[in-house]
């Protein structure tokens, strides 16, 4: 190691003289000398240039110490103590050998330079000597005066150059001495650092022994922890293996379910296609049904319009029937009043007749006693009594009703209120519109009139109890002709009194109404009227024709509209009706009859009294 360091230093000095100064300067830059330290330049070569020693100030450098500390820290942490001590010894030996080599080379170089200056022997390769020779050659011969002067001047110039070179050499020597001082300081500091490092290493050794003693316990605890962690690791591995098995099973189950779901999806897709096809078919069918429904709705609207017309017609007929019923009720009241008057008159006539009979009996007895001379007068008196006892003839009280409305009813199934109802063929009710009887002189005074009044009352009651309507106009009036009984002015004279009997005019055939065929529901108003008329004919024959006010109904022809289907979506609601006049008339009629009966009874009792 010493030979290598010496050879490297020798090569450096041989290459360039100025390199030593640079090298010394670089080494000085790494020194740790403090500011203000002075180094004396007293040396054995001080005699070369007299004068006081040069004092040099060395600048401190902290980077080297910090880098050395960092390096030592890394080495301390990486290498053992014995190796570090051995390396420190090697470093000290190398540094000492380097210092010896540097001092020897420096002395040798200084001796060579001083010897050259003293002997003035210049080397051929010296640039200054070459310049001097060139100058002499240019100036001429040395013998001449001018050349001698020029030679003297050249010599002076050479001396100046030599002095400059000497000055440079002195400066270089002073720099080398300062470098030497710096290196000595660096070595001193390095020795101090080495001693400090040894102390730290000893302390670290003691600490390491203590740490090792404590580390045994820690190692034992760590060993226990390691065993525990190994057991936990084995358990975790077993659990991981178990979880892997479970995962494999789950993957198999997942694959099975995936295939199953795929099949289900395919089946659902096929089912969806079928449903879509069925949906399309049902859509077409619904469109057809909607079209049919629209047609049926249009047809039902047409039928509803017809039903509305029929309803209006039936309502008009009902109004007319109510008017007719009201008129008949008024007529019934008038007839009851006339009946009461006639009953009073009949009672008066009966009383007079009884009185006349008693007188006649008395006269007859007187005539029998008087003789047969008065036979003619007795015969006349008997004839008068027979004629007087006879009832006055009944007049024609028949009411000729001229119908004004015809109903073309169409059999339609629907609401029953206010709308004509249909019946099956063959259920036509034929009733006699007019009950006829042979005309002639009546034999009873009260019975025909009572029968007519009873018949009228039956018709009125039946009309009040029914709710259907018919269209008819009431025309004409009932003429009641009272038979005037001629009473002789003087019964005592026994004159023949003749009472002419006026035959009532029979109704003309032109005014008689034919029987009407009524196409209505069984149990209706007209059926009740016909039944009442038939019962009246069978029980009490009328001497005069009594027509029933039944309006004829025209039967629809064979080519009329047929029966439409029922209308489930649009039922016709009949309008709300006010209380009919027939109901009000029935109430007022019954009250009027009761009043007339009471008045008749009161008058009869008053006369008897």
UniProtKB/Swiss-Prot annotation:
One Pfam family it belongs to: CortBP2
Region (Disordered): 1-29, 556-584
Biased segments, Polar residues type: 1-10
The organism's place on the tree of life at top rank: Eukaryota
Gene Ontology biological process terms from the UniProt entry: actin filament bundle retrograde transport; positive regulation of Arp2/3 complex-mediated actin nucleation; positive regulation of lamellipodium morphogenesis; positive regulation of neuron projection arborization; protein localization to actin cytoskeleton
Modified residues (Phosphoserine): 586
Biased composition (Pro residues): 563-574
Compartments, as annotated in UniProt: Cell projection, Lamellipodium; Cytoplasm, Cytoskeleton, Stress fiber
Remaining remarks: Named 'Nausicaa' after the princess in Homer's 'The Odyssey' who helps to ensure Odysseus' safe passage home from Phaeacia.
PANTHER family listed in its UniProt record: CTTNBP2 N-TERMINAL-LIKE PROTEIN (PTHR23166:SF5), FILAMIN/GPBP-INTERACTING PROTEIN (PTHR23166)
Protein function: Regulates lamellipodial actin dynamics in a Cortactin-dependent manner and is therefore likely involved in controlling actin branch density, actin-retrograde flow rates and lamellipodial protrusion. Functions by slowing the dissociation of Cortactin from Arp2/3 nucleated branches thereby increasing branch nucleation and junction stability. Associates with core striatin-interacting phosphatase and kinase (STRIPAK) complex to form CTTNBP2NL-STRIPAK complexes.
Protein name as it appears in the record: CTTNBP2 N-terminal-like protein
Species whose genome carries this gene: Drosophila melanogaster
């Amino acid at each position: 190691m010493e030979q290598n360091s010496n050879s490297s230093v020798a090569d450096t000095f041989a290459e360039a003289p100025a390199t030593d100064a640079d090298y010394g300067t670089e080494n000085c830059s790494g020194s740790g000398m403090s500011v203000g330290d002075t180094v004396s330049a007293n040396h054995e070569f001080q005699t070369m240039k007299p004068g006081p020693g040069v004092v040099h100030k060395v600048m401190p450098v902290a980077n080297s110490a910090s880098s050395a500390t960092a390096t030592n820290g890394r080495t301390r942490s990486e290498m053992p103590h014995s190796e570090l001590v051995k390396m420190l010894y090697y470093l000290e030996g190398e540094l000492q050998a380097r210092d010896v080599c540097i001092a020897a080379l420096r002395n040798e170089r200084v001796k060579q330079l001083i010897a050259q200056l003293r002997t003035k022997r210049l080397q051929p390769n010296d640039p200054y000597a070459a310049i001097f020779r060139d100058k002499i050659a240019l100036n001429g011969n040395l013998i001449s005066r001018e050349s001698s002067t020029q030679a003297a001047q050249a010599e002076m110039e050479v001396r100046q150059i030599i002095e400059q070179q000497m000055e440079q050499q002195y400066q270089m020597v002073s720099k080398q001495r300062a470098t030497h001082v710096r290196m000595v300081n660096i070595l001193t500091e390095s020795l101090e650092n080495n001693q400090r490092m040894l102390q730290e290493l000893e302390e670290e050794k003691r600490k390491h022994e203590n740490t090792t003693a404590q580390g045994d316990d820690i190692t034992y605890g760590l060993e226990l922890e390691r065993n525990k962690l190994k057991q936990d690791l084995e358990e975790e591995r077993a659990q991981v293996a178990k979880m892997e098995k479970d995962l494999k099973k789950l993957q198999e189950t997942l694959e099975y379910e995936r295939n199953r779901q795929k099949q289900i999806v395919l089946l659902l897709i096929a089912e969806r296609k079928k449903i879509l096809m069925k949906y399309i078919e049902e859509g077409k069918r619904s469109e057809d049904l909607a079209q049919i429904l629209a047609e049926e709705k249009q047809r039902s609207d047409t039928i509803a319009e017809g039903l509305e017309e029929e309803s209006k017609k039936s309502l008009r007929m009902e109004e007319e029937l109510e008017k007719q019923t009201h008129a008949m009720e008024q007529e019934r009241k008038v007839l009851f009043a006339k009946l009461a008057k006639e009953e009073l008159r009949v009672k008066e006539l009966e009383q007079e007749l009884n009185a006349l009979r008693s007188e006649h009996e008395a006269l007859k007895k007187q005539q029998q006693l008087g003789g047969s001379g008065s036979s003619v007068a007795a015969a006349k008196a008997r004839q008068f009594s027979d004629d007087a006892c006879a009832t006055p003839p009944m007049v024609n009280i028949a009411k000729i009703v001229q119908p004004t409305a015809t109903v073309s009813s169409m059999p339609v199934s629907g609401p029953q209120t206010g709308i004509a109802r249909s019946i099956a063929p063959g259920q036509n009710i034929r009733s006699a519109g007019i009950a006829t009887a042979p005309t002639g002189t009546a034999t009873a005074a009260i019975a025909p009139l009572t029968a007519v009044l009873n018949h009228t009352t039956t018709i009125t009651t039946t009309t009040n109890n029914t709710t259907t309507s018919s269209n008819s106009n009431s025309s004409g009036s009932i003429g009641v002709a009272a038979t005037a009984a001629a009473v002789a002015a003087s019964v005592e004279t026994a004159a023949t009194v003749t009472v002419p009997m006026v035959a009532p005019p029979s109704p003309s055939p032109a005014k008689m109404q034919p029987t009407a065929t009524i196409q209505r529901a069984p149990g209706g108003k007209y059926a009740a009227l016909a039944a009442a008329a038939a019962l009246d004919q069978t029980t009490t024959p009328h001497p005069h024709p009594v027509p029933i006010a039944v309006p004829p109904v025209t039967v629809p022809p064979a080519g009329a509209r047929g029966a439409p289907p029922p209308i489930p979506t649009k039922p016709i609601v009949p309008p709300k009706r006010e209380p009919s006049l027939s109901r009000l008339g029935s109430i007022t009629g019954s009250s009027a009859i009761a009043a007339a009966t009471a008045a008749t009874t009161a008058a009869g009792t008053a006369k008897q009294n």
